[in-house]
């Protein structure tokens, strides 16, 4: 099998100082780092600064149970009054609305009760007829389990829409009462009550318990799983390569190569995969133990542990494959995929419906979003498959297969083509240079010793 040929020039001691005076030496690290940080800033800030401006098909449920016409009028006005591109107003039954909320497919709902029209008529009649009555009411419910910011947007939108609807209903009711009384003047309290007749109540659907960080615990736990896979793969790859003798190990001032083990690239990658599997089993358990100790509610403990193991393995194996295939560049690619593009497209802190289209496109395949869906389903939504868990399992599995195929096939090809992990040409050249210098020093010492011996042998002969 052919051996890879050195492609590096031997080191030139005279070039040591000159090399750091070139534009390339200073420009390359600055440009690469600046580009990476610029992308980080643009992506992170671009995804969160204008959620209301970026709204698109934001789902809100409306339940009209009113037996009379007033509920339908409010519903029609609500649907017509809100931008159809920004909001997805779903007029559904009570059971369907509950399903949407339980699966995080709606951020809030408006409920119009069965007696709304009759209560509205009685309230109008009470303006001119003595007697006690109650204001007709509707209820706005937000869904923090789908997302805290999303629930806030839903509540704000429905509150503003109902303020407009309340004024319109008040105008119609005032005109109706005026027609019935022949235009007789009303008391100030009656006129004020008729102008805004609807009592808009606000509430929370299935509130989150204490210990969830106002709905952020799912996001941070998902982030921990992703970092365990990504960061773990970097640490494992570095240590394994050092222990096998293919990269130097530096501990403070100590710089050393371990005795090199004869092993192929593919076998090395298999070792890293095996360590990542073991690390995933332990890390997921440690995460759950710490979370429980800190008071985080974990309703489905072993299921969350199992999915955590699966997610860490998928991310860790894929990241290890990228590092093995691309070398040092694999670290930047992994960071780009799992962290830089992943966090703003997770749909955790800002709902995807309130982010620019680019992030919604990223969320279709980005690992962070899939892991978040799985963790949120297990922590907040009773582990329902239709609440994101099935999608999380499916796409996490796809990512795992991609990582296995990418690393396995390409490292195997590297081995077949002869791109073995032999000591680099630079190290060989340095060793040869050191050996040459050592031989030169020995030669000088031998020459000096010979001259000294010759001089000593000549001195007695001159004396005689």
Task: Label each residue range with its predicted role.
Residues 2-211, 215, 413, 417-464:
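Extracytoplasmic/periplasmic domains immediately adjacent to an N-terminal transmembrane anchor
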Residues 19, 258-262, 297:
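Helix-boundary and loop/linker segments of multi-pass membrane transporters
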Residues 172-185, 256-260, 281-293:
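Hydrophobic, membrane-facing alpha-helical anchors
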Residues 210-230:
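N-terminal membrane-entry
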Residues 225-233, 403-407:
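Hydrophobic core segments of alpha-helical transmembrane domains
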Residues 229-281:
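Juxtamembrane interface at the cytosolic side of transmembrane helices
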Residues 272-278, 286-444:
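Membrane-spanning alpha-helical segments of multipass transporters and channels
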């Amino acid at each position: 099998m052919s051996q890879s040929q050195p492609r590096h020039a031997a080191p030139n001691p005279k070039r040591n100082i000159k090399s750091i005076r070139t534009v390339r030496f200073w420009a390359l690290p600055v440009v690469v780092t600046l580009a990476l940080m610029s992308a980080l800033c643009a992506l992170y800030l671009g995804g969160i600064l204008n959620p209301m401006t970026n709204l698109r098909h934001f789902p809100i449920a409306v339940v009209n149970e009113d037996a009379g016409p007033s509920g339908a009028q409010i519903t029609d006005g609500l649907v017509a009054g809100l931008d159809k591109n920004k909001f997805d107003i779903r007029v559904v039954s009570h059971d369907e609305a509950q399903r949407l909320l339980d699966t995080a497919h709606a951020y809030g709902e408006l409920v119009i009760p069965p007696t709304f029209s009759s209560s509205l008529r009685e309230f109008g009649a009470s303006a001119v007829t003595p007697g006690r009555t109650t204001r007709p009411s509707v209820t706005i419910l937000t869904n923090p389990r789908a997302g805290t910011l999303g629930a806030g947007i839903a509540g704000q939108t429905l509150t503003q829409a109902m303020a407009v609807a309340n004024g319109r209903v008040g105008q119609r009711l005032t005109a109706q009462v005026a027609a019935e009384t022949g235009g007789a003047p009303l008391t100030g309290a009656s006129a004020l009550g008729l102008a805004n007749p609807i009592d808009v109540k606000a509430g929370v659907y299935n509130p989150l318990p204490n210990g969830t960080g106002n709905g952020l615990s799912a996001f941070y736990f998902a982030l921990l799983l992703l970092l365990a896979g990504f960061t773990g793969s970097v640490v494992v790859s570095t240590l394994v390569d050092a222990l096998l003798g293919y990269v130097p190990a530096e501990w403070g001032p100590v710089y050393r190569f371990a005795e090199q083990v004869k092993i192929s690239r593919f076998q090395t990658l298999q070792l890293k995969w095996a360590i990542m599997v073991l690390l995933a089993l332990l890390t997921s358990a440690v995460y759950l133990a710490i979370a429980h100790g800190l008071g985080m509610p974990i309703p489905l403990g072993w299921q969350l542990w199992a999915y955590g193991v699966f997610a860490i393995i998928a991310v860790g194996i894929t990241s290890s494959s990228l590092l093995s295939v691309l070398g040092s560049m694999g670290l930047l690619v992994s960071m780009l995929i799992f962290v830089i593009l992943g966090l703003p497209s997770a749909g955790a802190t800002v709902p995807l419906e309130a982010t620019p289209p680019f992030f919604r496109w990223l969320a279709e395949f980005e690992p962070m979003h899939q892991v978040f869906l799985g963790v949120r389903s297990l922590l907040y939504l009773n582990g329902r498959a239709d609440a994101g868990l099935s999608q999380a399992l499916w796409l996490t599995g796809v990512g795992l297969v991609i990582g296995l195929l990418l690393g396995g096939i390409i490292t195997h090809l590297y081995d077949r083509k002869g791109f073995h992990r032999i000591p680099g040409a630079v190290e060989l050249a340095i060793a040869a240079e050191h050996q040459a210098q050592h031989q030169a020093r020995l030669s000088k010492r031998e020459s000096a010793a010979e001259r000294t011996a010759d001089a000593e042998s000549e001195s007695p002969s001159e004396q005689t």
